[in-house]
Amino acid sequence: MEFDSDGVRLHYELHGPDSGTPVVLVHGFASDYRLNWVGTRWQETLTGAGYRVIGLDCRGHGASDKPHDPAAYALELMAGDVGRLIDHLHIGSAHFIGYSMGARIGLQVLLDQPTRLNRVVLGGIGWAGAFHVAADIARAMRGEPTTSQIAQTFYEFARARPINDLEALAACILGPQSPMDPGKLASITNPVLVVVGDQDDIVGKVDRLVESIPTAKLVKVAGRNHMSAVPAREFKEAALEFLAG
């Protein structure tokens, strides 16, 4: 299924019972809904628990449009895509689970449109994320040399999937980003769960992020890094318990 989000065609999927509580799932950078949430059995887990899953392919990813202009990937625009999807479906609000880039998008939705989201799970996110090496990642996506291991990891991950447009991904990582603002984070009132692998060396200072959000609690998944935390049983169990309130 598709909808128009401020002139950009975005792909989304619906799964689970029509009567289920809606949960929007937003994937990480260079991934897409199916890779992030289906192969890792998140869709199966959530629909099995009775939720109505709304899976979005972010702009520049999956089956959605892939602009090559970094301005098209401003964080506020990508957060706006979530709000416009909720409007398109006429559901008012939804729970939210995002990973890595998807978590950063969810955090921005909390700041810009807090009434669109209910309970929010932010996975693979910290104070910095990968954006401090954005220029290196963009160079890697364009096949240019880089000494950044993080950039090389993302490049190898991205190029393994033919659906990816590496120039669009370079533009995405260079899109305008709003820095973390402790004052704004302190205004969040939605319940928030932050989940990271305890071996994640990409996200930065997760404790600083959690301490800045009054409603946040933190779960660390033992033995998992940024790439391996998504399918972890402990992550799913923590999310289900949290969403149930």
Question: Where on the chain are the PLM-derived regions?
Answer:
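Catalytic histidine neighborhood in serine/cysteine hydrolases
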Residues: 210-227
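Active-site loop/oxyanion-hole signature of alpha/beta-hydrolase fold enzymes
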Residues: 38, 44-48, 55-95
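Catalytic histidine-centered segment of alpha/beta-hydrolase-like enzymes
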Residues: 224-236
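Conserved HGGG/HGGXW glycine-rich cap/lid loop of the alpha/beta-hydrolase fold
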Residues: 8-65
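Short beta-strand/loop motif that positions the catalytic acidic residue
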Residues: 188, 194-196
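Conserved alpha/beta-hydrolase "acid-adjacent" motif
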Residues: 201-207
